[in-house]
Amino acid sequence: MKFLFDLFPIILFFAAFKVWGIFTATAVAIVATLAQVAWVAFRHRKVDTMLWVSLGVIVVFGGATLVLHDEKFIQWKPTVLYWLFAIGLLAARYAFGNNLIEKMMGKQLTLPHPVWDKLNVAWALFFAVLGVANLYVVHNFTESQWVNFKLFGTTGAMVVFIILQSLWLTKYLKDE
């Protein structure tokens, strides 16, 4: 259910784009992300840093898209967000000694610390590659194809990555 909730702004962006175009879709994505943050704050009294970063990036890049009437800003937004996530994961681990992947998943999984470090680096690399892939699609495909990639391509890549990660982790999980 959380996965669908996380996709909420992207799905609304996609639907609005198909009906009204990129600028209305951008406004819808901003409002949907604001609503998402408000709901999480109301419901849980705490909003994850990643969601705050997502909100900041959509407001800045979406706002620039609307004010300057230039779709390139919203098209760059996923790349900036993915690269911020990658940098955040690596900086937290290697500059501050905090493995954010372990903090997020440590209650569900018991893994040796070197495995957590590999997982952290794998996620950082995954986000870095997603950022590059987004730029490639932005500069080599149509706006409509980019919107399809944004929903289906990145979501599909995420699902495949999680499945591969799960398969890799099975050799480290203890029988319970």
From Swiss-Prot:
It is a multi-pass membrane protein. Its main location: membrane. Keywords: Cell inner membrane, Cell membrane, Membrane, Transmembrane, Transmembrane helix. It holds the Pfam family IspA. The chain crosses the membrane at residues 3-23, 24-44, 49-69, 81-101, 121-141, 149-169. GO terms for cellular component: plasma membrane. InterPro entries: YciB. It is found in: Cell inner membrane. It comes from the Bacteria. Belongs to the YciB family. Plays a role in cell envelope biogenesis, maintenance of cell envelope integrity and membrane homeostasis. This is Inner membrane-spanning protein YciB.
